[in-house]
Amino acid sequence: MRDEFQISLGSGIAAFEAKQFSQAWSLLKPYAEAGDASAQYRLGIMCQIGLGQVRNEQLAYHWMSSAADQGYGLALHGLGQMYLDGDCTVQDEGKALACFEQAADLGLEGAMVALAQMYQQGRGTDKDTGKAKALFKRAGFDPEALPS
């Protein structure tokens, strides 16, 4: 039964990656409702952007935060971006910073860059160019070559 679960979940993820969003929604929704973070994350993206359906901010936040609560790195990064931009939720730079920190700790380079920019600009935290440079370097960028 576990193999069948993985095949069906894999089909939903493949449909998402192939931009077959209506099919992806149908395939992924049961797994998201059962608590699968990868399915929840993808439903969150579809709701946030309006892929295969009308944009739904409340559902976008629900699915993205459900996946993030399980420590799913991409969802932590996505939720951080939602908080940073005030998209699908109230803007909260402190919560954005916390999400990006968790995602960066999981090795997500995009989260490291977002976090570095927050430290560089003093958003949600005190300005700290040393931390910003260290994060840019950890993400694979030459901090000295980046604009300040």
Model-based region annotation:
Residues D3-E4, E33-D36, I49-L51, N56, ...:
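Short helix-capping/linker turns of helical repeat alpha-solenoids
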Residues E4-A34:
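Alpha-helical segment of the N-proximal tetratricopeptide repeat
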Residues S8-L9, A14, R42-I49, L76-D85, ...:
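Hydrophobic face of amphipathic alpha-helices that form TPR/SEL1-like repeat modules
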Residues E17-S26, V54-W63, V90-C99, D126-K137:
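Structural signature of tandem alpha-helical TPR/SEL1-like repeats
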Residues K29-Y31, S65-A67, Q102-A103, R138-A139:
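Canonical positions in the second alpha-helix
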